[in-house]
Swiss-Prot record:
Keywords of this entry: Cytoplasm, Methyltransferase, S-adenosyl-L-methionine, Transferase, tRNA processing
Role noted for this protein: Specifically catalyzes the AdoMet-dependent 2'-O-ribose methylation of cytidine at position 56 in tRNAs.
Main location: cytoplasm
Pfam families: Trm56
UniProt-recorded name of the protein: tRNA (cytidine(56)-2'-O)-methyltransferase
Organism lineage: Archaea, Methanobacteriati, Methanobacteriota, Methanomada group, Methanococci
GO BP field: tRNA nucleoside ribose methylation
Length: 179
């Protein structure tokens, strides 16, 4: 199963840091690609620097029409929309995992930066809430991806990494490849 993240909306200066965190969280927790609906050179370059240093094959893409992208994806994949107004993650997560496992389909995860159009709710196979209190989309994304993968991606190591951290009880264990 491949996981892609579709970030709806991005408000330039206001969102560049949080959008970067959305991309880095996506990469760190198992997604293969993040798709933005707005061009942002700063976010793209930040993500590319991380991938260059920490490895992997994470992709950054910009699409003109999120609707077209999501509709095409849904033809052969499963679309989950993270929203405060969706079904309780504790009640629906097993069903989502089983659906993916049974169908062997890829997953598109929609998260918003601003008010999400009604069409996203209608298009999604699942509208899922991670709690019913206001919090960050980064938190919702991290919790969902961790639950989806059952913690298996937390300590992933990536091919071609120039920097690697090894968990340790008492010291920093960092490997840095010299050029």
């Amino acid at each position: 199963m491949a996981i892609e993240i579709l970030r709806l909306g991005h408000r330039g200066e206001r969102d560049k840091r949080i959008s970067t965190h959305v991309a880095l969280t996506s990469r760190a927790l198992g997604a293969e690609k993040i798709i933005f609906t707005e061009e942002d050179k700063h976010v793209k370059e930040s993500v590319e620097r991380i991938v260059d240093s920490w490895g992997g094959d994470f992709k950054f893409e910009v699409v003109k029409s999120w609707r077209t992208y999501a509709k095409r994806f849904k033809d052969n994949g499963i679309v989950v929309h993270l929203t405060m107004y969706g079904e309780n993650i504790n009640k629906i997560m097993t069903e989502i995992r089983e659906d993916i496992s049974k169908t062997n389909k890829n997953l598109l995860l929609i998260i918003g930066a601003e008010k999400v159009p009604r069409e996203a709710y209608d298009l999604a196979n699942y509208n899922l809430s991670v709690g019913n209190q206001p919090h960050s989309e980064v938190a919702a994304l991290a919790i969902f991806l961790d639950r989806l993968t059952e913690g298996k991606t937390l300590y992933s190591e990536y091919d071609n990494a120039k920097i690697k951290v090894t968990p340790s009880k008492s010291e920093k264990c960092v490997f840095v490849e010299k050029d």
